[in-house]
Amino acid sequence: MNELTHVNSAYLRHHAKNPIHWKFWSDGILELAVQENKLIILSIGYSACHWCHVMEKETFRNELIANFMNQNFICIKIDREEHPEIDHIYMDFILNTKGNGGWPLNCILLPDTKPVFAGTYYKADDWLNLISRFYTIFKENPDKLIAYSKNYIEHLN
C-alpha cells in the first residue's frame, strides 16, 4: 500500500496515487528491508523539480514497473526539502561515483541502506531494465553488491 496519501509535502502527495507501494524512511521500514533481505529503492525529489514530475508520470505510474518494484524491493520516497540530511548522504554517493548528480535522485541500497547505485531520471524501459539487473545480481550473487558498497565506503575513509 502506498503510504503517501496523508502527508504535508506537496511532492509526496503527488506520488500518493502511484501504484508503487511507497513508504517513508523510518526505522521500521529499514528493519523490514533487513528482515526480508530486500534491496531498497530510494527515490528523492522535490516539488519544483521538472524531471521528478516527468519520471513520476512516465515511469512510476507504469503498472508493470510498479508490480516489479512492489514484489522485489522496499520502495521509499523522500522529499529532499523535508529530509536534506538523507538527500545529502546519497547525493554525496552519486557525486563521488559519477561526478555529477541531480534530481530525481534514484538510488539502489542494500538492505542495511549502504548504496550500490545512484542515478537521476530514467525512462520507463530503462528503469525497468536497470532495477531488473540489480535484482538479479542481488539474488544470484549478493556478495558482489556487498563488496562494491564496502569498497566505496573504504575509499571514502
Regions from the language model: what does each represent?
Residues 1-157:
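Replace the tail clause
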